[in-house]
Swiss-Prot record:
CpcE and CpcF associate to form a lyase. GO terms for cellular component: phycobilisome. GO terms for molecular function: lyase activity. This is Phycocyanin alpha phycocyanobilin lyase CpcF. It holds the Pfam family HEAT_2. It comes from Synechocystis sp. (strain ATCC 27184 / PCC 6803 / Kazusa).
């Protein structure tokens, strides 16, 4: 758990409601209520919920973790479940949504190798939205290059939704790190000629328009 805060009676009550929920619907409601507090004190329980076989509760927990933000990252990364694929996939989605650069390695691996296309897509887009600006100046260029190189690789993914996510991530990176605009333009102008899916081709053209003149 982040910080030195003590669990308040209200948070304790909401945690207990999650732990004692006796139906899928009650569990979802209890998780939503706990997530709505946006309290770092809720992070351990929300992370535990990711292991449950309840997609509705997992979605609510992921949304809550994203709202809590950076304060959730230490616990999330320290408690990645290597034996429970579902929990790890949900945690990866949470990390992608939070945008903390500490998730770089996790998102790179997920974007390139996860067998679930929804996880690869979330990781790819999440890479492009990592807040590398929060890092020390001397680390920023290395992280930018890691993001760019990974997303260029992801553009070869066989699933169009994953390629779409990679293009969205690349666009945001180029908007924030302007020295990537020309390399990205060069890549996309070539890539669009090879892209078989019209919707991805349209996304590429939109990106070229959005990143604007050099």
């Amino acid at each position: 758990m982040e910080g030195n805060s003590v669990v308040t009676p209200e948070i304790e009550r909401l945690i207990q409601a999650v732990e004692t929920a006796d139906s899928a619907a009650k569990l979802v409601g209890a998780v939503r209520a706990l997530a709505a507090t946006r309290s770092p004190l809720a992070v351990p329980q929300l992370t535990t919920v990711l292991r449950y076989n309840n997609p509705g509760a997992a979605v609510a927990a992921v949304d809550g973790l994203i709202q809590i933000g950076d304060a959730a990252m230490t616990h999330l990364l320290a408690n990645m479940d290597g034996y429970n694929y579902g929990a790890r996939a949900w945690a990866t989605r949470a990390c992608a949504g939070i945008g903390d650069p500490r998730a770089l390695a996790l998102l790179q691996e997920a974007a390139l190798t996860d067998f679930a296309l929804s996880v690869r897509r979330a990781a790819a887009k999440g890479l492009g939205f990592l807040r590398w600006q929060s890092l020390p100046q001397e680390e920023q260029e290395t992280v930018q290059k890691a993001i760019y190189d990974t997303l260029i690789q992801v553009c070869e993914d066989p699933e169009w939704v994953v390629r779409y996510g990679a293009i969205a991530g690349l666009e945001n990176l180029a908007k924030q790190a302007q020295h990537y605009r020309q390399p990205l333009k060069d890549f996309l102008q070539s890539f669009v000629e090879q892209e078989p899916e019209a919707i991805v081709g349209e996304r590429i053209l939109w990106t070229l328009e959005n990143i604007g003149p050099i």
